[in-house]
From Swiss-Prot:
Enzyme class label: transferase
Function noted in UniProt: Catalyzes the reversible transfer of the terminal phosphate of ATP to form a long-chain polyphosphate (polyP).
Region (Disordered): 1-21
Record-annotated active site: 449
Gene Ontology BP terms: polyphosphate biosynthetic process
Assigned protein family: Belongs to the polyphosphate kinase 1 (PPK1) family.
GO cellular component, one term: polyphosphate kinase complex
Name of the protein: Polyphosphate kinase
Cofactor: Mg(2+)
Originating organism: Streptomyces griseus
Catalytically driven reaction(s): [phosphate](n) + ATP = [phosphate](n+1) + ADP
Listed GO MF terms: ATP binding; metal ion binding; polyphosphate kinase activity
Length: 703
């Protein structure tokens, strides 16, 4: 494992050609560019209006997490003196300045998009997001009653004076800073009122007219401070360091000793203060002083703050204002055309492997049905399963409980530390244990991120293993919104690999090599680099050669260096990335590298790795992104695709995603992304997701 090395002081291997400086783009800048692409979808008038509201909420939620984790980590590195340059050559201080400048621009654009486009356009469709003064007297009277009955009892006004120290402001909470005056003494006082997070963010004043909850509280502050004059109130919101796990960057290993105390406290230091533009300088000064934030961390914005509340608006039942409804179909290899009975998935897998592409192929009639059938089948002896993120009421969890209760051996490998999901994960892990499942909590120091299921079944005199290897979590809800791949197979090699890997995860196996899997942290990075290098040899020998990756993030320096070497040697390298990309394309050092990004109604989540291999293409897919944490500190698995039809389908997918006729963003050598949504004649380019939806619809229409 390379994790002992300092990731920020990455030294390339000194074999072969010297690679030029400047081949890495800054990862934080690249992440902000990714969130800008989300914002562009919200700004695009061609996106349905409720989906635009949804993208505004996604942008806000993404940025919250970015500040809580990445910005907090940078500040921590600066404060503790672990300030090595990043791979892009910038000092942490320079990166922080860049983030502050860029995020300020993006947050201003985000607020303007809401004020100038989204709110007025929603109003045109009869969904009015209004402020307290815009309400009718009747609406105000109704909301006053609501305030008295449902809001007032849960509010806690906290005074600030010599007897009452400044209260602790929890991360991401909405707060009112209130200035009151005592009419007797004439003294001004400051108080803080927290907006209860469990109350609905936008309340319906009358049908299709919504008002932010903080407006209702602000309009009735006299109720909270009887006998006092309310002089002013201002909204503010604090973002804190809440990255509970020390991960993400190898540099942070040095910090663990220094950080133990801090990490034990849930309350990290503030990293951002959002305030309304109209805030009184006296109040702002007090907040800045008490919260100990710098001027650069203060973000004045037009209200309302905290637009993640738009998720609720986006989920209103107005289908005509959303993307056209799409219902996933059952994969044709699993569909029982003849009968209405549930298909026998094991019988189907004895005939052939099934390549699933969610959400176009239904999760519930494939992966979920596979596990449910296994749970109810008397011939199934054992089920082994990894769970990284799932929902507590998940049918997957129910199936595993049923299996354990009917006497089957059930091993569940649970990853408790899926960030920000810890509570939920602990809950259903207990539920599984109580039912008699063997629950294992991963390997020390390694997160289990691979997506695997293994079913062992008695068939005559032999035991047969059936497997599922995927790119996405076993989470039926996200399976409808995330684009993911999965392989259901009865192949004995994959079955043997999964048996070995599960033994490694639950016991003391030291196996490092597998038949059809590449497994991190040992063989995955080296396996991919060896294959990239092999493409150079194929190219020099005049055989077909290419490298095509589809990933969520492309940051790992060793993988990037291998790609740059291949590109320098003349091998075409195509990278289809959703989020961060630190590889600099199409410059004189890498003219053979093309980078594209696609965002849309589904979150592109699958990871695919394809190699020309001298005319015999090799294709892998699985759970791993090209990041340190995935390759060094997580158990990840990629599976080799052996069925020629499956290889061809995945190659077609990658070609379509990279094609100039497909709508996408293109990364330039300067690190800037440009959106390509129309052709030279101004006609809209096709979106890969729309093409796949269309293909599924056509397939269903043909008998």
């Amino acid at each position: 494992i390379r994790s002992g090395r300092d990731a920020d002081a990455y030294e390339p291997d000194r074999d072969g050609d010297e690679l030029p400086q400047g081949r890495f783009l800054d990862r934080e800048r690249s992440w902000l560019a990714f969130n800008e692409r989300v914002l562009e979808l919200a700004e695009d008038p061609a996106t349905p209006i409720l989906e635009r509201a949804n993208f505004l909420a996604i942008f806000a939620s993404n940025l919250d997490e970015f500040f809580m984790v990445r910005v907090a980590g940078l500040k921590r590195r600066i404060a503790t003196g672990v300030a090595t340059r990043s791979a892009s050559g910038l000092q942490p201080r320079e990166v922080l300045d860049l983030i502050w400048t860029r995020s300020r621009e993006l947050m201003a654009r985000h607020a303007a998009c809401y004020q100038q486009d989204i709110a007025p356009d929603l109003s045109d469709e009869g969904i009015q997001l209004i402020r307290w003064p815009d309400l009718t007297e009747k609406e105000q009277a109704r909301l006053f009653t609501f305030f008295r009955q449902r809001v007032f009892p849960v509010l806690t006004p906290l005074a600030v004076d010599p007897a009452h120290p400044f209260p602790y402001i929890s991360g991401l909470s909405l707060n009112l800073a209130v200035v009151v005056r005592n009419p007797v003494s004439g003294h001004r006082h400051f108080a803080r009122v927290k907006v209860p997070p469990l109350l609905t963010r936008f309340l319906e004043a009358s049908p299709q007219r919504y008002v932010p909850i903080e407006d209702i509280i602000a309009a009735h502050l006299e109720e909270l401070f009887p006998g006092m004059e309310v002089l002013a109130h201002h909204m503010f919101r604090v973002t804190r360091n809440e990255d509970l796990e020390v991960e993400e960057d190898d540099a942070e290993n040095l910090l663990q000793a220094l950080e133990k105390e801090l990490m034990r406290r849930r309350f990290g230091p503030p990293v951002r203060l959002e305030v309304e533009e109209s805030i009184d300088p006296y109040v702002l000064d007090l907040l800045v002083r008490e919260l100990k934030v710098s001027d650069a961390e203060v973000y004045p914005l037009p209200g309302p703050l905290e637009l993640t509340g738009l998720f609720a608006i986006a989920s209103l039942d107005r289908p005509e204002l959303k993307f056209p409804k799409f219902i996933a179909g059952t994969h044709r290899d699993l569909a029982e055309v003849e009968s209405a009975s549930a298909p026998d998935i094991f019988a189907a897998l004895r005939e052939r492997d099934v390549l699933l592409h969610h959400p176009y192929d239904s999760f519930s009639t494939s992966v979920q049905a596979f596990l449910e059938q296994a749970a109810g089948d008397p011939d199934v002896l054992a089920i082994k399963q990894t769970l990284y993120r799932t929902s507590g009421d998940s049918p997957i969890v129910d199936a595993l409980i049923d299996a354990a209760e009917s006497g089957k051996q059930v091993l569940v490998l649970v990853e408790i530390k899926a960030r920000f999901d810890e509570q939920a994960n602990i809950k259903w892990a207990r539920k599984l244990e109580e039912a008699g499942c063997h629950v294992v909590y991963g390997l020390v120091g390694l997160k289990t991120h691979c997506k695997l299921s293994l079913v062992v079944r008695q068939e005559g005199d032999t035991l047969r293993r059936y497997s599922h290897v995927g790119t996405g979590n076993y989470h039926p809800k996200t399976a409808r919104l995330y684009e993911d791949l999965g392989l259901l197979t009865g192949d004995p090699q994959v079955g043997a690999d999964l048996s070995d890997l599960f033994n490694r995860l639950s016991g003391y196996s030291r196996r490092e090599t597998y038949r059809r899997l590449l497994v991190a942290p040992k063989s995955l990075r080296d396996g991919l680099i060896a294959r990239i290098n092999k493409e150079i040899a194929h190219h020099r020998a005049g055989r077909p050669a290419y490298v095509r990756f589809k990933v969520n993030s492309m940051v790992d320096e060793a993988i990037i260096d291998a790609c740059c070497r291949a590109a320098q040697a003349g091998v075409p390298v195509d990278i289809w990335v959703r989020g961060i990309c630190a590889i600099r394309p199409a410059s004189r050092l890498s003219e053979n590298i093309r980078v594209r990004s696609i965002l849309g109604r589904f979150l592109e989540h699958s990871r695919v790795f394809s190699f020309g291999n001298g005319g015999e293409p090799e294709v892998w897919f699985g759970s791993a992104d090209m990041m340190h944490r995935n390759l060094d500190r997580r158990i990840e698995a990629l599976v080799r695709v052996t069925d020629p039809a499956h290889r061809a389908a995945l190659s077609r997918l990658l070609e379509t995603g990279m094609a100039d006729t497909t709508a996408s963003w293109h990364l330039g050598p300067d690190g800037n992304w440009t959106r390509h949504a129309t052709d030279a004649d101004g006609q809209p380019l096709r979106h890969v997701q729309e093409m796949l939806i269309e293909a599924r619809r056509r397939r269903r229409a043909t008998p």
